[in-house]
Amino acid sequence: MKKTLLASSLAVGLGIVAGNAGHEAHASEADLNKASLAQMAQSNDQTLNQKPIEAGAYNYTFDYEGFTYHFESDGTHFAWNYHATGTNGADMSAQAPTTNNVAPSAVQANQVQSQEVEAPQNAQTQQPQASTSNNSQVTATPTESKSSEGSSVNVNAHLKQIAQRESGGNIHAVNPTSGAAGKYQFLQSTWDSVAPAKYKGVSPANAPESVQDAAAVKLYNTGGAGHWVTA
């Protein structure tokens, strides 16, 4: 990504602070966190425009990863800029009146210099996360959470999605609020209408996975997905 930096607005940051001028230091004499200062300058961190990087007078110039950075203060006024190493930097001679209050001040350079800077691409791609929406709490046995294991019934993709939304694929899941149970969270009356005679009156959560799958397929084929709220 490229962006144009204007020396009048971004390459030069000027603030005004109260205080007396101190000693002048150079980058070679100071223990600077160059990486941090470079990152703040590249991102136009407003902290650099609001206050000096340290108290007193200083004059730091250093090169870091293809750019030259300059930070200076006379103890009252402060300024900073950066430019691609090997090119001319922005004019640092701008002055502002002394005041007792800390305040950022915009400075217009005599000659506006523009340069194209290759901005680092730090965008991180976030993978969408599927979330299960279910107002009722479902209790489940942790060891029985995989869908379609131990079942030879051909379950279509939509039913598999319904099972995941309803119970996370847990064949023993039971909803204590509604009484719905099993992999597909059958109500007992619905279960009894599609279950084999052997399992009528038995909780769906106690039926084998293949029996639950077959009952769900039968219900889906005869009445569609409308029996499930999460469908």
Swiss-Prot record:
Q: Where is the composition biased (Low complexity)?
A: 119-137
Q: What is the lineage of its organism?
A: Bacteria, Bacillati, Bacillota, Bacilli, Bacillales
Q: What is its main location?
A: secreted
Protein's UniProt name: Probable transglycosylase SceD
Is Electron transport there in the keyword field?
A: no
| Region of interest: Disordered | 103-153
The UniProt entry, under InterPro entries, shows: Lysozyme-like_dom_sf, RPF
One family from Pfam that matches here is Transglycosylas
A GO cellular component entry from the record: extracellular region
Main EC class of this protein? Answer: hydrolase
Per UniProt, the keywords (alphabetical) are: Glycosidase, Hydrolase, Secreted, Signal
Which region is the signal sequence? 1-27
Q: Where are stretches of biased composition, namely Polar residues?
A: 103-116, 138-153
Q: What does this protein do?
A: Is able to cleave peptidoglycan and affects clumping and separation of bacterial cells.
Location in or out of the cell: Secreted
* E.C. code: 3.2.-.-
Induction of its expression: Positively regulated by sigma B factor.
Q: Which family does it belong to?
A: Belongs to the transglycosylase family. SceD subfamily.
Native species: Staphylococcus aureus (strain COL)
Q: Does the keyword Hydrolase apply?
A: yes
